[in-house]
Amino acid sequence: MAGKQIAQRPGFLKDFIQNFRLDALCLFDEKRILISQELPTPKQRWAEGHEIGHLIIPWHGPISLGDDKYTLKANCHEAMEAEANLAARRLLFLRDKFKVRALSSEPTLSHVAELKKLFGNTMTTTFYSLVEVLDIPAFGLITDHPKKPGKDFDRFNPCRYFITSPSFDSQFGQITDQQLYAIVEKYCRWGKWDLGATETVLTDNNGERSVFHMETIFNHYDALT
């Protein structure tokens, strides 16, 4: 996002984009969205949807023009980004049409690939959206390739995203992404797509044990489990 001062100073706008390495930028005053051409084409659609989310959520615009004691808090900006992501998912996945399709088949990575083609979004955003709408206990991990993590990999925060279905939250809320990623590291192999699969037993909040099927692929950008 950017405020009025950025829109009125093109030179500053260029420096702003380069210094902060932005993939997308929303100019509220002009109702204009800028997308970096360096961003892979499949991801540009998501970036545009995300910035549209900022535009259509009423309270995001005023915040882009300045900060007060509330908006300076980190959790405020985290909330804004989460809301923009939610808006993007609702726009790009056609609201409840995606949920109907998502629940029409077993929740496998093959099904994710089918939904990706049907709705025209990236594998990663489709995967994220599928896990969220499942009506069974399920989770998803979005990470680096387990066998060749990036330079900024953090052992204590190994997952870029840890997605859970509502029933997983209510029944397995004590399970952490670190625990699950440790399992992924054990079964994953070197590869460019299919990294492996396994079954694991997780204990719920009541002490009952359930078997979960886990599978991981790498789509050149993210490892999806």
PLM regions: where:
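Active-site hotspot residues in diverse enzymes, especially metal/ion-binding acidic/histidine motifs
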Residues: 1-225
